[in-house]
Amino acid sequence: MDNDYTTSTTTSRRPRFWGFFFILFPLVSFLMWTIGLIVLLGLWSTQDKWHTPSEPDPVYLSDMGAYTKGFFIPMCVITGVFYFLTFIMIRLARQWGWIYPTGRKVETYLGWFAALTGAAAASCLISLSIRDDVHHDNVHWKFTAAFVVLAFVSAASNIFEWLSATRYYPQSSLLRVSFIFKFVIIVVGIICAIAFGGLHHNYRGRSARFEWVVCFLWSIYICLLCLDLAPALFYDSLASAPDLEKGAYATSVPESYVAPMEPPAAVLPDGEERYATPDLVPDTTAQYPYASATEPGVSNIPETRPERPVVYNMDVSQTTTTTRPVLA
């Protein structure tokens, strides 16, 4: 296994402030995008819904952005920049061991590819907000299509990276929940994006609804990125947490690892005992006088033993035989 993380177990504890700093990036992106969508929907609803026979019901988000560029452009800029920085923070946090340390080289490649495509998606989001569909209709929808594709590619890279991480952290319920929800969101989002593009010319009202659904699904996905960086907040309980056991302080050995106990002594057929380590050998000097108490395993039996006496020319006649009486 290719390890990108150190195996030192003496890493000092990090301050809680840095955990909030990391999670701040996806949180700002999520709040800015979600609040912006709600504000634009509220403006459309309070302004008589801009409902005319030629406009879809509800109106396209792009149309709302074209008439509220003073709000729509900062909304897209803040969302896009912090969305890109979120992937940078995730990759750095994994390399530094603040969250799940990297287990394979492919995770590093997927993480940086997600950051690269996230930067491209953020650029397209900012560009489509500037080139609105009222004055630059063709260019605007090209940027919109590029943004949707790049955002899904970035999300797919992040999902595959998390899928690879679940192999080394199967005990992490947080990691597993994040992966499952992201996978469901990206599948539903792709279906809605296809419906949005397919209904754009003939059924504009339905197409606009799918556009709003895709936007809110992307908002939920950004919220899940906050969940990915949440372990950085719990540095005190990280070593003993059951779902982050392996990656506590950038170590490859779980902090709760307990060495196995020595196996019990095995009883041999001749009655002797064989112990796994010399430290477990009991003091049997009194029972076995030839055993050494200071050096286990060393015998004090003399090298030359006295020979047994041998009797030659035994006179069989000297032996006596006792006859037991036979009862009649």
Swiss-Prot record:
<dbReference type="GO" id="GO:0006629">
    <property type="term" value="P:lipid metabolic process"/>
</dbReference>
<dbReference type="Pfam" id="PF10277">
    <property type="entry name" value="Frag1"/>
</dbReference>
<feature type="topological domain" description="Extracellular">
    <location>
        <begin position="200"/>
        <end position="213"/>
    </location>
</feature>
<feature type="topological domain" description="Cytoplasmic">
    <location>
        <begin position="164"/>
        <end position="178"/>
    </location>
</feature>
<feature type="topological domain" description="Extracellular">
    <location>
        <begin position="131"/>
        <end position="142"/>
    </location>
</feature>
<keyword id="KW-1003">Cell membrane</keyword>
<feature type="topological domain" description="Cytoplasmic">
    <location>
        <begin position="1"/>
        <end position="19"/>
    </location>
</feature>
<comment type="similarity">
    <text>Belongs to the SFK1 family.</text>
</comment>
<feature type="transmembrane region" description="Helical">
    <location>
        <begin position="143"/>
        <end position="163"/>
    </location>
</feature>
<feature type="transmembrane region" description="Helical">
    <location>
        <begin position="179"/>
        <end position="199"/>
    </location>
</feature>
<feature type="transmembrane region" description="Helical">
    <location>
        <begin position="70"/>
        <end position="90"/>
    </location>
</feature>
<keyword id="KW-0812">Transmembrane</keyword>
<dbReference type="InterPro" id="IPR019402">
    <property type="entry name" value="Frag1/DRAM/Sfk1"/>
</dbReference>
<keyword id="KW-0443">Lipid metabolism</keyword>
<feature type="topological domain" description="Cytoplasmic">
    <location>
        <begin position="235"/>
        <end position="328"/>
    </location>
</feature>
<feature type="transmembrane region" description="Helical">
    <location>
        <begin position="110"/>
        <end position="130"/>
    </location>
</feature>
<keyword id="KW-0472">Membrane</keyword>
<dbReference type="GO" id="GO:0005886">
    <property type="term" value="C:plasma membrane"/>
</dbReference>
<feature type="transmembrane region" description="Helical">
    <location>
        <begin position="214"/>
        <end position="234"/>
    </location>
</feature>
<feature type="topological domain" description="Extracellular">
    <location>
        <begin position="41"/>
        <end position="69"/>
    </location>
</feature>
<comment type="function">
    <text>May control the production of phosphatidylinositol 4-phosphate (PI4P).</text>
</comment>
<dbReference type="InterPro" id="IPR050911">
    <property type="entry name" value="DRAM/TMEM150_Autophagy_Mod"/>
</dbReference>
<feature type="topological domain" description="Cytoplasmic">
    <location>
        <begin position="91"/>
        <end position="109"/>
    </location>
</feature>
<feature type="transmembrane region" description="Helical">
    <location>
        <begin position="20"/>
        <end position="40"/>
    </location>
</feature>
<protein>
    <recommendedName>
        <fullName>Protein sfk1</fullName>
    </recommendedName>
</protein>
<keyword id="KW-1133">Transmembrane helix</keyword>
<keyword id="KW-0444">Lipid biosynthesis</keyword>
